[in-house]
UniProtKB/Swiss-Prot annotation:
Gene3D superfamilies: 3.20.20.210. The keyword Lyase applies. Substrate binds at R27, Q28, A29, G30, R31, D77, Y154, T209, H327. This is Uroporphyrinogen decarboxylase. The record marks D77 as: Transition state stabilizer. GO terms for cellular component: cytosol. Pathway: Porphyrin-containing compound metabolism; protoporphyrin-IX biosynthesis; coproporphyrinogen-III from 5-aminolevulinate: step 4/4. InterPro entries: UROD/MetE-like_sf, Uroporphyrinogen_deCO2ase_HemE, Uroporphyrinogen_deCOase. Homodimer. The lineage of its organism: Bacteria, Pseudomonadati, Pseudomonadota, Gammaproteobacteria, Enterobacterales. SUPFAM superfamilies: UROD/MetE-like.
Length: 354
């Protein structure tokens, strides 16, 4: 495999010395970029874009041509796994993702297959291999999956949800069915992420977007327990290097200590958690990724720089910080504001690594 020219991101995740704080943006390949919109129009629809390795590679690389980012992230979607289980994923205009056959009971769970990542999800592995080839060792490639709980919310609700009443009804009225689904998803995600690593992903991230809607006790039982199982089953060495694992529960700042016990290398933080406080609590165990409010990118450049400086100061001197937004970049952010953000992180962080 090609030697990495910039391994800052991987080093920071392992709390090793770096020259400046590495930075990337969740959803950095996305609708705020006019070139992304053009490629998506060429593909026809979102899933066609995901399933075409050359086009998925193109949109993965687009933000790297604009900004000096320290990592690329595979262009895909967390719902590829439930789609491969046969739930019939489609996208409703203005509604987001929907499934034609939601999971309603234990009998539905029992019928679900565990997808073969090189078969039903082979298009994702083709994209990983294509992106790795085209990156030519410039920066590392991040692979990812949704967490079992987050995937289950879409599968049981039949799509996006605001109140999560359908899955919570299953959780409280038929916990056995939900545990069976989460267990099957944990196995599927472990296979899926390991296949991404074998195909060339140099780090992986588990997105638990909806873990924050749970009580503390339910989070431990229905979300964290299954992410822990995945972390235990992942390939942690490949191609002569450690493969770092980041867990990110949006709205999960109160559970960082428990998350840090899973054996992951890093935790993602959303913008509601104070990074200085997070470092005091778990910084001796894991690296931290985050955590600027994505809406800050609407602010004037001077205000963006001020916020970057504040977060860098909050984390302080030393290793173990990957700068990011606290969630995905919004689709109507001016692309030049993202550029201000990335440049500010590199320039203003140098003093913390001397």
């Amino acid at each position: 495999m090609t030697e990495l020219k910039n391994d800052r991101y991987l080093r920071a995740l392992l709390r090793q010395p770096v020259d400046v704080t590495p930075v990337w943006m969740m959803r950095q390949a996305g609708r705020y970029l006019p070139e992304y919109k053009a490629t998506r129009a060429q593909a026809g629809d979102f899933m066609s874009l995901c399933k075409n390795a050359e086009l998925a590679c193109e949109v993965t690389l687009q933000p790297l041509r604009r900004y000096p980012l320290d990592a690329a992230i595979l262009f895909s979607d967390i719902l590829t796994v439930p789609d491969a289980m046969g739930l019939g994923l489609y996208f409703e205009a203005g509604e987001g993702p929907r499934f034609t056959s939601p999971v309603t009971c234990k009998a539905d769970v029992d019928k679900l297959p565990i997808p073969d990542p090189e078969d039903e999800l082979g298009y994702v592995m083709n994209a990983v291999r294509t992106i790795r080839r085209e990156l030519k060792g410039e920066v590392p490639l991040i692979g990812f999956s949704g967490s079992p709980w987050t995937l289950a919310t879409y599968m049981v609700e039949g799509g996006s949800s605001k109140a999560f009443t359908v899955i919570k009804k299953m959780m409280y009225a038929d916990p056995q069915a939900l545990h069976a689904l989460l267990d099957k998803l944990a196995k599927s995600v472990t296979l899926y992420l390991n296949a991404q690593i074998k195909a060339g992903a140099q780090a992986v991230m588990i997105f638990d977007t909806w873990g924050g809607v749970l009580t503390g006790r339910d989070y431990q039982q229905f979300s964290l327990y299954y992410m822990h199982k995945i972390v235990n089953g992942l390939l942690r060495e490949n191609d002569g290097r450690r493969v770092p694992v980041t867990l990110f529960t949006k709205g999960g700042g109160q559970w960082l200590e428990a998350m840090a016990e899973t054996g992951c290398d890093a935790l993602g933080l959303d913008w509601t958690t104070d990074i200085a406080d997070a470092r005091r609590r778990v910084g001796n165990k894991v690296a931290l990724q985050g955590n600027m409010d994505p809406s800050m990118l609407y602010a004037p450049p001077a205000r963006i720089e001020e916020e970057v400086a504040s977060i860098l100061a909050g984390f302080g001197h030393g290793e173990g910080h990957v700068f990011n937004l606290g969630h995905g970049i919004h689709q109507d952010v001016p692309p030049e504001h993202a550029g201000v953000f990335v440049e500010a992180v590199h320039r203003l962080s140098e003093q913390y690594h001397r």
